[in-house]
Amino acid sequence: MDSAHSKLEQQLQQIKKAKITAETNVDQTRRKQNEQDWLEEDSHQLTQEKRVLLDFLRSGWQGEEASGFHRYLEEQQHEESQAWRRDLQDKRTDLDIELQENKDRLHTLETKQATLQKEWSQ
């Protein structure tokens, strides 16, 4: 009986440590998501500022060469903006998956802990 209780107690301690690690991972992932939110807001703001600047430049440029260069800049800006958006979305998806995996791990540990505590009290 003492051996069984000792083994259960040891398993409960291991689960407790694993839960702390899983909770820390969840918190870290949430912090990463908050940082990602800030990056997305900054990216959106920069995109708006680039559009305003390109509109300003367009109004000052004249002639076919200037117009062609302006179109080139708009295309470059659009491509860069699309690449940034894709990258931000990929990172957002990765963080969502990471958070869900951490939550699943935590849930599994909590379930296992409850089962062991039930055994302990019997």
Predicted regions and their residues:
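Short, low-to-moderate order helix/coil transition modules at the start of elongated helical scaffolds
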Residues: 2-6, 74, 93
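Extended, charged amphipathic alpha-helical "stalk" segments
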Residues: 2-3, 38, 68, 121
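Extended alpha-helical coiled-coil "stalk/arm" regions
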Residues: 32-66
